[in-house]
């Protein structure tokens, strides 16, 4: 299977998941989506309070080696057992989800361009850039509503780990992107957010298709040269 591997990076709350969802809707059943968040390391022997204080925005928080091995398996046409992470418990669960190979594999996460080995696996690298104020608002809403966090804990985590790690690791990885998506203002009532989202996604889809076509053309040329 000639698999296209797409990486979508960007800061917390930048819109990575939204973009991923729209791309998946566009490409349909030929897409598999994997989140780097699923590969947070298991916190063995730590209490809930200790797990809550872990710096989850540092590269060492992730089992990226396992993700790399899983992507290699998928590209080779073999299914994987993807870990399941609980944001409520701050820990990996004992469950896994079977993921099948697909023509297009999308990997999303804040630090997927930070690791050179993982970064070099992507055929197309997309970075979603959004204003920091908008990102913290989105994160606060998400964590309070979906992950059982308090507003105080969200703000504390943002100031102590999220913001410093973004500046040290996430933002510098933007330079590796083939495509940079500038997200719309979250609270700008003067624009039609739905129209802007559709426009951004349409543009991104066209760029992805262009990169994919270019990649296939280059691969065909190399194969032809090998035959000669």
Ranges and model annotations:
Residues 25-34:
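Post-Walker A helix-loop "phosphate-sensing" segment adjacent to the P-loop in P-loop NTPases
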Residues 16:
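Conserved lysine of the Walker
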Residues 32-33, 41, 45-89:
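Conserved nucleotide-sensing/catalytic segment adjacent to the nucleotide-binding pocket
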Residues 5-7:
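Short hydrophobic/aromatic beta-strand immediately N-terminal to the Walker A/P-loop
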Residues 94-147:
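ATP-dependent NMP and nucleoside kinases share a basic, alpha-helical "lid"
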Residues 19, 23:
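Hydrophobic positions on the alpha1 helix immediately C-terminal to the Walker A/P-loop
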Residues 100-101, 163-228:
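NTP-dependent small-molecule kinase module
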Residues 11:
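P-loop (Walker A) phosphate-binding loop of NTP-binding proteins
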